[in-house]
UniProtKB/Swiss-Prot annotation:
The species this protein was found in: Clostridium botulinum (strain Okra / Type B1)
Major enzyme class: ligase
Pfam families: SAICAR_synt
NCBIfam families: purC
Family, similarity comment: Belongs to the SAICAR synthetase family.
Entry protein name: Phosphoribosylaminoimidazole-succinocarboxamide synthase
GO function terms (MF aspect): ATP binding; phosphoribosylaminoimidazolesuccinocarboxamide synthase activity
Amino acid sequence: MEKKDMLYEGKAKKIFGTDDKDTVVVYYKDDATAFNGEKKGTIEDKGVMNNSITAMLFELLEKKGVKTHFIEKINEREQLCKKVEIVPLEVIVRNIAAGSMAKRLGLSEGRKLDTTVFEISYKNDDLNDPLINDYHAVAIGLTTFAELKEMYSIAEKVNNTLKEFFDEQGINLVDFKIEIGRFNGELLLADEISPDTCRLWDKSTGEKLDKDRFRRDMGNVKEAYMEILKRVNK
């Protein structure tokens, strides 16, 4: 496998082509952003930690029957992945009220929800990734109802698997967001699963072990990510 030119650079990752048209190299950066890029900073070794956490969690999910774009971890910052066409939606899964949902609905942060909540947002930086519903997504040509049904099914499997896994590590999976990619007629879990994309709270202390520490200037951001890596790597 030969790494080629950079195809795309996002907030947290760079994507490079390879000599195989069906694969890409994903490079994890230390850059940190919040509030749709309004707040910027760096977290030392974040890319290294998120690359490892994502690789381990994607391997776990593959074993549980969730198809992903992940092929293998190449080095401490890079992984080889299938070259998917990203559906321009984020699927957000919420088990406990927190963040924007708690604020939007006037709920106390930490309230256990009576059922898992599934939301979608339109991946569009210019619009600040607005929440939309299924009908919006289909009406403006982003996806189909059949594809959405499959995306929600993938999200539910990911939630069930990760909730159980993190529970065993003494962590509450509060909420998370995922991206889905199209590849040879299939839908695959793509992007990453890490403290950048999940809210993870210590079960016994309630301590936040995720990017909220950066968003809210709570300090000890690197230490929180290291703690998640340590527990995932048990």
